Regions:
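Generic short alpha-helical segment signal, independent of protein family or function
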Residues: 55, 100, 104, 193-194
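Active-site-adjacent substructure of cysteine-protease-like catalytic cores
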Residues: 110-165
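Active-site-adjacent structural segments surrounding the nucleophilic cysteine of cysteine proteases
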Residues: 1-85
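Noncatalytic regulatory segments and standalone regulatory/sensor domains
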Residues: 151-194
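Short, well-structured alpha-helical interface segments that form or flank functional binding sites
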Residues: 37, 41, 45, 90, ...
Length: 194
């Protein structure tokens, strides 16, 4: 029997929408950010999803200035705005710099470029309820940032898929993920962050 394992913070509300449980116990109304929800591209959306899941900022603070410029989300938005709309995407070095300068108390960065070690490292993070930002190569000229939130175990008790949130696609009601990364077919995973 195939099993699907997802991080503990994820929940479906009474309407079937994906929400996350904050450390304070408050459920957030939104986990998945789709391109167009923020000013940026997939890397920025992946960061926003991870920070939201980890409770770095609350969903309701996005459009509120009650906390002034100290709100964690506004720090991210200011940092993203320094780079405009990322016409060439958010580079790993820019993401690392943004995270280490502003969010180092919330997020650990672990950079790896070896395909062989990535699935096991991601599984370790998921088992600790830590979502993982990953950059994958879609083809020779295109990469995409995604957030791994779970994995699938096949009948042989082997990890076969990573379950992801992808900002390119809508998240359907009743779903915990909107992307599946087939580990047998991955050819060029490049980076992993958690």
């Amino acid at each position: 029997m195939k099993q699907f394992i997802v991080i503990d913070q994820l929940r479906l509300n009474e309407k079937g929408a994906l929400v996350c449980k904050k450390p304070s116990g408050r459920l957030c109304s939104k986990v998945h950010f789709k391109q167009g929800d923020l000013d940026g591209v997939c890397g920025a959306y992946s960061l926003a999803m991870v920070f939201n899941i980890l409770g770095v900022f609350e969903d309701s603070s996005r459009n509120s200035d009650e906390h002034g410029n100290r709100a964690a989300e506004w720090k991210m938005i200011r940092s993203l705005n320094n780079q405009d709309l990322y016409p060439n995407g958010l580079k790993p070095c820019d993401m690392i710099k943004m995270v280490t300068q502003t969010y180092s108390k919330y997020v650990t960065i672990d950079h790896t470029g070896r395909k062989a070690g990535i699935p096991l490292k991601v599984k370790e993070c998921i088992d600790k309820n830590a979502p993982v930002i990953m950059q994958i190569s879609c083809n020779q000229d295109e990469t995409q940032w995604i957030v791994a939130v779970g994995y699938a175990i096949d009948e042989g008790n082997e990890m076969s898929y990573l379950l992801t949130l992808d900002s390119r696609k809508d998240l359907r009601i009743g779903h915990f993920w909107n992307g599946i990364l087939n580990l047998d077919r991955c050819t060029r995973l490049k980076y992993g962050f958690h």
